[in-house]
Amino acid sequence: MARAEGDSWDVASSVGATAAMVAAGRAVATRDPRGLIDDPYAAPLVRAVGIEFFTKVADGEFDITELDPSSAAEMQARIDEMALRTRFFDDYFLASTAGGIRQVVILASGLDSRAYRLPWPDGTVVYEIDQPAVIDFKTSILAGIGAEPTAERRTVAIDLREDWPAALRVAGFDSAAPTAWCAEGLLIYLPPEAQDLLFDNVTALSAAGSTVATEYVPGILNFDAEKARAASAQMRERGLDLDMPSLVYHGERKHVMEYLTSLGWTMAGLPRTDLFAKHGVPMVAHDNDPLGEIVYVSGTYQNR
């Protein structure tokens, strides 16, 4: 079903289900002996969501490369990318806090468990923003397995299409303190104008020295829905009915690096191929990837 203005979801439906997909990828990467990431909470969260396909992937009962044996190497590269994407944002947060930042905001936090698994410095406050059903689910499941945050975790249960800056302030956010902002895997699910508004708000809330990290997805401009549906069909044959093309907003939008630069941020980009090379992971060309050559971007706010 296509997206609609004001649509909502939980962790097992629509955009919410993509959080389980990403968490399943983190669970697979956590078992990988290369040790690119360590997310002990990914698999328990996926199991709790209850989508059988993702549970089997997370628990190692189904090898995702078997979806299409003719392109097993490409499928492995997709799993590797999930691990490396996670590692990119992990490293970003660790670098930001090493530089003295003690206020963190994770936009559309989904099943992200960084507030529980990263070694945050004393005094760090991590704000998680997402829809109420998603926040409540994750909080309940992690409490149920005895997980405890490694920073002061403050949840902001609100849709990003609503007045989240006001809700963030109510939760105790200090706009006078530098902040590490993260918008991981989010932008393709926002209309172009909402993407701009998101970063307008982030900038308005940022003190000098704040940092930001997100992705630039060039393929969303000329999004190939047929390629995406072909990939969805492979999963549907395994019992997963998730129509990814209907969840994303494609078409022309502003280049996120250029837009943030225009707002006073000093930005840098790391193309996907360079991210793989940085960690010594072989890169297989994604000939059928409808999202194109993703660039991971980060930067620092210079002026207010």
UniProtKB/Swiss-Prot annotation:
InterPro entries: Ppm1/Ppm2/Tcmp, SAM-dependent_MTases_sf, SAM_mthyl_Trfase_ML2640-like. Signal peptide: none annotated. Its EC number is 2.1.1.-. S-adenosyl-L-methionine binds at residues 130, 159-160. One of its GO terms (biological process) is methylation. One of its GO terms (molecular function) is methyltransferase activity. Gene3D superfamilies: Vaccinia Virus protein VP39. It holds the Pfam family LCM. Keywords: Methyltransferase, S-adenosyl-L-methionine, Transferase. It comes from the Bacteria. NCBIfam families: mthyl_TIGR00027. Belongs to the UPF0677 family. Exhibits S-adenosyl-L-methionine-dependent methyltransferase activity. This is Putative S-adenosyl-L-methionine-dependent methyltransferase Mkms_1059. It comes from Mycobacterium sp. (strain KMS).
